[in-house]
Amino acid sequence: MRKPFYKILYVQVLFAIFVGILLGHFWPDTGVAMKPLGDGFIKLIKMIIGPIIFCTVVTGIAGMSDMKKVGRVGGKALLYFEIVSTFALLIGLGAAHLLKPGVGFNIDPATLDTKAIEQYVSKAHGQSTVEFLMHIIPDTIFSAFSNGDILQILLVSLFFGAALAAIGERARIVVQLIEQVSKVFFHIVHVITKVAPIGAFGAMAFTIGKYGLGSLVPLLKLIGTFYFTAIVFVVFVLGAIARATGFNILRFISYIKEELLIVLGTSSSEAALPHLMEKLEKLGCSKSVVGLVVPTGYSFNLDGTNIYMTMAVIFIAQATGIELTLLQQLTILGVAMLTSKGASGVTGAGFITLAATLAVVPTIPVAGMVLILGIDRFMSECRALTNIIGNGVATVVVSAWEHELDRAQLKRTLQQGGEDEAELADAGQNV
């Protein structure tokens, strides 16, 4: 028996987003006051991300008898990330040149007030490649979890899982315990997901109430160019990769629609991380590959952020009348490939990464970021959506490369569409 449509999670989230837009538009002060609802939901999800990554990675690695396999999976994932990220950067650059969203502004950078972007620039100046790599190593095992840093948690999990695998059968009881604890944490995720509509409502009401739909009008061409380019990237680039791997990108998007709507409402791809990992396992990807690829992808495979970065840089150059040479554009690409690795799945990280890129390329004034500050929140939804789709596709691809993908289950699950989602939602209700 099918559930009434109003009890389906993605319908509830869609309705909540719509109501949030109305509230923020007509009663902006009330909309801004709804911010704690969105923040609270994201904090609930972040509370559980660390333990879930730890349990998933540890049990996955502990189940691998060959530690070379861990390195092989990680190496293939990083290779995939670099290739696809480069495509994303190039597509963002090409689209900005082709559609010219910044031409016609004729803005003098000296007239721009940079006070609003000082917090982003100061954070960006603190980032460097060496510091980023050193930051991956936590001060203590516990600080990785208390800080909620995904890469630090992943590093701790890799060491812990490798140690359990080395000990072998004597550590079997520990592995079994972690497997059971993992089930508890995923059950908590199902409970938290029930309030996703409230979180999406609060976050969207705040966004519209604070920034207003009117702030979109002057920069509609840039927003339209970015959204159009992201759609082209997902449909054609990720679509071609998916087709080569043996699945349809549109069916895959339909399969993770609940996660996408949560991301749309909260502007944070981290909000859907636990559910995405569970969905990918149900899709036929091995637990070990999911545990390694998804968390790593949240810092190394941000396709939406990459498209945004090169497009935003060219937009600022066009708006301020700066002509960039081929060498300067290649420099921007190289710098962006490094700075994008410092971005995480949280709101605002893409803007900080853009500041880091501009700081290394003095030809383009950092003050130009003021032009897109007001609309960055509206663009962050598209960044986060593209990022999560890209990470999902990457996990399926690496699983296929490792022969760790149950293709029959993949085909069956995608063909069934929403049936598995209904079962997942029912499981969450039986608490």
Swiss-Prot record:
Membrane topology note: Multi-pass membrane protein
Superkingdom of this protein's organism: Bacteria
Subcellular location: Cell inner membrane
GO molecular function: fumarate transmembrane transporter activity; malate:proton symporter activity; succinate transmembrane transporter activity
DNA repair listed as a keyword: no
TM regions (residue ranges): 8-28, 44-64, 78-98, 148-168, 188-208, 222-242, 307-327, 355-375
Pfam families: SDF
Alphabetized PROSITE patterns for the sequence: NA_DICARBOXYL_SYMP_1, NA_DICARBOXYL_SYMP_2
Any one annotated GO CC term: plasma membrane
Keywords: Cell inner membrane, Cell membrane, Membrane, Symport, Transmembrane, Transmembrane helix, Transport
Main location (coarse class): membrane
Gene Ontology BP term (one): L-aspartate transmembrane transport
Classification via PANTHER family: AEROBIC C4-DICARBOXYLATE TRANSPORT PROTEIN, PROTON/GLUTAMATE-ASPARTATE SYMPORTER
NCBIfam families in alphabetical order: PRK01663.1, PRK13027.1
Protein family (similarity comment): Belongs to the dicarboxylate/amino acid:cation symporter (DAACS) (TC 2.A.23) family.
Job of this protein: Responsible for the transport of dicarboxylates such as succinate, fumarate, and malate from the periplasm across the membrane.
Record protein name field: C4-dicarboxylate transport protein
Organism listed in the record: Cupriavidus pinatubonensis (strain JMP 134 / LMG 1197) (Cupriavidus necator (strain JMP 134))
